[in-house]
Amino acid sequence: MALVPGRSKEDGLWTRNSPGSSQHPESPRLPNPLWDRGKIGKVEGHQHIQVSTSSACVWQLAYPPVWPNLPAVPIQDFSQKSHLPSIVVESSEVNEESGDLHLPHEELLLLTDGEEEDAEAFFQDQSEEPGWAWSPQDPRSPLRTFNAGLSWGQDQDEEDACWILEDTACLEATNHCPFWDSTGSRVCRSGFVEYSHLLPPNSFEGAEEEAVQTPAGVESGAASEAPGGRGCDRPRADHAAPPQEAGVQCTCQHYTVREEAQKTPPADPACPEREDSHGSGSPFKASQD
């Protein structure tokens, strides 16, 4: 801030024609704006004037003793700048020949609150289209990327084959093994785990029926030979599993049942029908019993 100090009373009155007066033509002091507002005086190295450029707006105040009752008035406004917010983008490359600056490849995008919400809603709607998935790691697009496994010409069934549905859906199983009959078999798919219940092969249908009928014959024989409630400790036929479940279980234990049938079980006086059911006992013993 620059100030123009006035003279003290000891120096005498400050008249207009005195050499120290601001209205004197040879005076180095600044003119008073109350007399001449159109002129802008020049300051040329006066010892009582100090100029400071620390602030953006510089004022000069004068306290002349001629008007002791007047308040301090501004003389001159050197600069008054309005600071606007700006965005500075540093250049990545400089062409030495032409001197052109190459800006970075990243685009600078400024969105207001309303535009940001609209853009977010737009990308969410686009992500629900078939063939699009969220992928923030894709350098081409920060929000979505196209699934290369799908094409726009494919049907909905082919799309379901690539994407696992959230709801549990039963689909027909493919024939993975040539000797297995996949007709009537179903595969229940839930999430990423497949649960398959396949029917036994056609070549083992006769052996399966024999294995299923064997426990029923044993139970009937045990019921006839033990009227008093004594007999083999085996589960009853009415409490057995359904035919389909029994068939699935016998498929897993098919070879085990055949191996047990080939072996000769020990003689059990309480269950003589075991030898007849498996066919491993001698006919003479069976007739005596």
Curated annotation (Swiss-Prot):
Expressed in bladder cancer tissues (at protein level). Residues 1-128 form the LBH domain. Residues 15-25 have a biased composition (Polar residues). Residues 1-36, 205-289 are annotated as: Disordered. GO terms for cellular component: nucleus. InterPro entries: LBH_dom, LBH_dom_prot. It holds the Pfam family Lbh. One of its GO terms (biological process) is positive regulation of DNA-templated transcription. Coiled coil: none annotated. It comes from the Eukaryota. This is LBH domain-containing protein 1.
